[in-house]
């Protein structure tokens, strides 16, 4: 599985298309998600899902640190893990989903990072932990953030994610990787990258010609 990490999400999305197992406009997030902790990290792991509310107070308790049962749910999934948290009031993003304390908890639970459609905070401190956070934006306060449930399907920027889904995230967004083809993807992605590099090299060469470009494209099409 780690061989996937040498590629980016664009390479992997192209490779998935070759198997024809889903529509080309499915299986990835829509625009708006960003890595707020900076850099260009690549997250690869199994989704540990939860749903929270940040705008309204919970019926009992005060925050989602009051709910420790979801930690057991996280640990029931294979590692490496990615915490995937849907804010049911994400349009306002009133309360931060994760900050420094909970990032430390999630990292201790072998989560490689987290993904949310909501907001996060304590960004410099979490960045120093090397715990990537992919979110809509930053927020000052956690507001009334509390867990509604966990271990259920969530929806993040148009992508439906189920517990245990294999996810790959980078600066472009998140792509969901079908388990049945995961082992084959690195080889397919590598072939595509070689084919694309031929075209790029030709375009940057003093020997460039449109005839040569058409030949390179035909060769690429024949190899697909």
Model-based region annotation:
Residues 1-163, 177-224:
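Feature captures the catalytic cores and cofactor-binding loops of soluble hydro-lyases/lyases
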Residues 167:
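C-terminal binding/interaction regions
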Residues 170:
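Beta-strand-loop-alpha-helix segment that lines the small-molecule cofactor/substrate pocket
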Residues 173-175:
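Channel- or pocket-lining gating/hinge segments that regulate access to a cavity or pore
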